[in-house]
Amino acid sequence: MPLTVSCPICKTPVEWGPQSKFKPFCSERCKMIDLGDWASEKHAIPVKSEFDLDALDELGYDEDSFFKE
């Protein structure tokens, strides 16, 4: 029995196999909707900042002069 997953966009059952051209999506339409959601930043991968943003304030740089050459 083939594995069946739900389309992440419309929840239509999708058979997971070589015949499923757009897996895990049911169609190109759902695939493009998902791509648009990523492009418009409706989805994001959570990451932990490498540095403490509050610590940057303690450096004492003036924003008006920081980016000037």
Curated annotation (Swiss-Prot):
Keywords: Metal-binding, Zinc. GO terms for biological process: regulation of DNA-templated transcription. Pfam families: YacG. Gene3D superfamilies: Erythroid Transcription Factor GATA-1, subunit A (3.30.50.10). SUPFAM superfamilies: Glucocorticoid receptor-like (DNA-binding domain). Belongs to the DNA gyrase inhibitor YacG family. Inhibits all the catalytic activities of DNA gyrase by preventing its interaction with DNA. Acts by binding directly to the C-terminal domain of GyrB, which probably disrupts DNA binding by the gyrase. NCBIfam families: PRK00418.1. This is DNA gyrase inhibitor YacG. It comes from Shewanella oneidensis (strain ATCC 700550 / JCM 31522 / CIP 106686 / LMG 19005 / NCIMB 14063 / MR-1).
